[in-house]
């Protein structure tokens, strides 16, 4: 099944929700970055969360960056989404290995770290991007995203994210959900949301059995009459290009370029999101220098 996001609202208008199936884009990220299982799980969760958050943005060209710095061995976990839910991302240390937790699951929280911050940057093409930062709640990603919405945007939110890694280290299933209460939601609504989540069980297991994100949404919101608003295909998508890299080199300024030509002759730059390598010869750099 192709990766996609489904958005819905309850018939009484009190709950809005999204769910994503993201196995393919998570597997693509694994292949690009050569992540080991715990890094695959952490990055996969971040990509799924950022995709659902980015897809909700209004305005062509808007983007959302989700950055997690937890002080753990993975280093920074970063995911960037456009306003259609297409994502790219990386972890600083993709080769991290940790023992499984006592329950046999990957120790994502241990790899991410428990002491640090989650930052969301929304670039809506206004004068300044919106930036919201919270202290991590545990480093498991889903609860931290929910905490961000509660603390920074005052929106009561439940988030579930899961990545199931197969024996050969490929991604078996991945995805999640984001459920948010609208103003005026009652205590009864909260109880129904919490009850549905508890009854449904782990996200990765649900998606392994049935990869349809609409069915995931209906499983965790079984006590609600849902109206499906839209279905959006999503993918792992990098926007790098040689032209963008050239602009980045030009932005270094004359002095830096002259030094690069003198000391290195040329340079080789790789995209941190997709690992595409861009080679610039001495002549290429001299051409860029002449354009200044």
Predicted regions and their residues:
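Cys/His-clustered metal-coordination modules, chiefly Zn-binding fingers
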Residues: 198-292
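Interaction interfaces in information-processing and related assembly proteins
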Residues: 1-230
């Amino acid at each position: 099944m192709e990766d996609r996001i489904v958005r819905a609202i309850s018939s009484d208008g009190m709950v809005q929700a999204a769910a994503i199936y993201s196995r393919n884009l998570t597997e693509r990220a694994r292949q690009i970055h050569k992540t080991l299982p715990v890094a695959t799980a952490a990055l996969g969760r971040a990509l799924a969360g950022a995709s659902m958050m980015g897809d909700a943005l209004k305005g062509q060209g808007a983007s959302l960056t989700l950055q997690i710095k937890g002080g753990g061995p993975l280093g920074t976990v970063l995911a960037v989404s456009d306003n259609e839910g297409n994502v790219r991302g990386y972890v600083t240390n993709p080769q991290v290995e940790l023992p499984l937790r006592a329950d046999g699951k990957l120790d994502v929280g241990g790899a991410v770290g428990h002491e640090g911050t989650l930052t969301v940057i929304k670039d809506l093409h206004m004068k300044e991007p919106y930036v919201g930062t919270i202290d991590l709640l545990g480093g498991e990603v889903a609860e931290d995203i929910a905490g961000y919405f509660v603390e920074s945007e005052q929106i009561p939110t439940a988030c579930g994210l899961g990545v199931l890694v197969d024996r050969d280290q490929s991604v078996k299933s991945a995805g999640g959900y984001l459920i948010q209460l609208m103003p005026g939601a009652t205590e009864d609504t909260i109880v129904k949301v919490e009850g549905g989540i508890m009854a449904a069980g782990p996200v990765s297991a649900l998606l392994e059995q049935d990869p349809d994100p609409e069915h995931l949404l209906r499983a965790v919101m079984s006590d609600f009459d849902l109206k499906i608003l839209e279905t959006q295909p999503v993918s792992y998508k990098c926007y790098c290009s040689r032209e963008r890299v050239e602009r980045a080199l030009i932005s270094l300024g004359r002095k830096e370029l002259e030094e690069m030509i003198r000391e290195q002759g040329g340079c080789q730059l790789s995209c941190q999101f997709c690992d595409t390598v861009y080679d610039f010869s001495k002549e290429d750099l001299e051409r860029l220098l002449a354009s200044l």
